[in-house]
């Protein structure tokens, strides 16, 4: 059987399931966590079945990654994980492992970079993979071998839905976010450039250099770009997922029994 890799953004799945159960006020904390663990395990089992995976891994975030050191305001406004959930992560990891899925928590890398590295390596070897996450940062990786699945909306993301949502082609998303920024992760983008201007730039120019070389570029946009080029460079690096992480394990070790 040809390998098929399932890549689960673990905290993305867990936090969303937990958020629903946390609203059930008539449950004790213990009951709530038990219910969340069961629902996470059920989700993993369903994903194994629906994707027909032969290999699978659920990746957690390590300690603060290079992005936090590279840009001090990265994710600074994001609400911290509830302590009760943080303390119970060992239970969630055990629940996932019981489904046969390998659990991996790097020392100081984000799950996004680990998953991107795995998907990229698999793709280069003509191995299909499914990334399970609601994180839009994975969308630039969509190709004939890499799919992105939203477990909560029960659908796969595609080129048309991306174009409709962001107003740009999938292959230009990184450039789009470098200009417009990403508020959910406190990535600034270029000061004064919003969604409309970012769409104009990426839909009409192949690069920021191409835009600046066009005499027809508006004086306002030219000024914003030239005065804030440093933030464009920083933002582009922040939104670009790494595919060169040294994993320390091979695809063979992710095979399901």
Curated annotation (Swiss-Prot):
It holds the Pfam family 5_3_exonuc. It comes from the Bacteria. It is an enzyme of class 3 (hydrolase). CDD domains: H3TH_53EXO (cd09898), PIN_53EXO (cd09859). Keywords: DNA-binding, Endonuclease, Hydrolase, Magnesium, Metal-binding, Nuclease, Potassium. K(+) binds at residues 179-180, 188, 190, 193. One of its GO terms (molecular function) is 5'-3' exonuclease activity. Its EC number is 3.1.-.-. Residues 192-197 are annotated as: Interaction with DNA. Binds 2 Mg(2+) per subunit. Only one magnesium ion has a direct interaction with the protein, the other interactions are indirect. Binds 1 K(+) per subunit. The potassium ion strongly increases the affinity for DNA. Residues 169-256 form the 5'-3' exonuclease domain. Its cofactor is Mg(2+); K(+). Mg(2+) binds at residue 112. Gene3D superfamilies: 5' to 3' exonuclease, C-terminal subdomain, 5'-nuclease. GO terms for biological process: DNA replication, Okazaki fragment processing. Has flap endonuclease activity. During DNA replication, flap endonucleases cleave the 5'-overhanging flap structure that is generated by displacement synthesis when DNA polymerase encounters the 5'-end of a downstream Okazaki fragment. PANTHER family: 5'-3' EXONUCLEASE FAMILY PROTEIN, FLAP ENDONUCLEASE XNI. HAMAP family: Xni (MF_01192). Belongs to the Xni family. This is Flap endonuclease Xni. The lineage of its organism: Bacteria, Pseudomonadati, Pseudomonadota, Gammaproteobacteria, Alteromonadales.
């Amino acid at each position: 059987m040809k390998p098929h890799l399932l890549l689960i953004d673990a905290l993305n799945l867990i936090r969303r399931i937990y958020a629903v159960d946390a609203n059930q006020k008539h449950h004790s904390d213990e009951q709530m966590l038990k219910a969340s663990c069961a629902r996470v395990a059920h989700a993993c089992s369903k994903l194994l079945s629906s994707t027909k995976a032969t290999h699978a891994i659920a990746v957690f975030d390590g300690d603060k990654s290079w992005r936090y050191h590279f840009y001090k305001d990265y994710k600074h406004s994001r609400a911290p994980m509830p302590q009760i959930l943080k303390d119970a992560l060992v239970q969630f990891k055990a629940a996932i492992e019981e489904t046969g899925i390998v659990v991996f928590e790097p020392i100081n890398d984000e799950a996004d970079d680990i998953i991107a590295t795995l998907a990229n390596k698999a793709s280069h070897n003509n191995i299909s993979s499914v990334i399970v996450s609601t994180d839009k940062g994975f969308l630039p990786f969509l190709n004939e071998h890499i799919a992105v699945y939203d477990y909560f909306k029960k659908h796969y993301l595609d080129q048309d839905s991306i174009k409709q949502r962001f107003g740009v082609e999938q292959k230009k998303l990184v450039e789009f976010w470098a200009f417009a920024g990403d508020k959910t992760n406190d990535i600034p983008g270029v000061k004064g450039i919003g969604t409309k201007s970012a769409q104009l730039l990426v839909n009409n120019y192949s690069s920021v250099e191409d835009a600046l070389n066009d005499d027809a570029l508006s004086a306002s946009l030219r000024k914003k770009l030239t005065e804030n080029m440093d933030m464009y460079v920083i933002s582009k690096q922040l939104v670009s997922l790494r595919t060169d992480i040294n994993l320390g394990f091979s695809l063979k070790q992710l095979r399901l029994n």
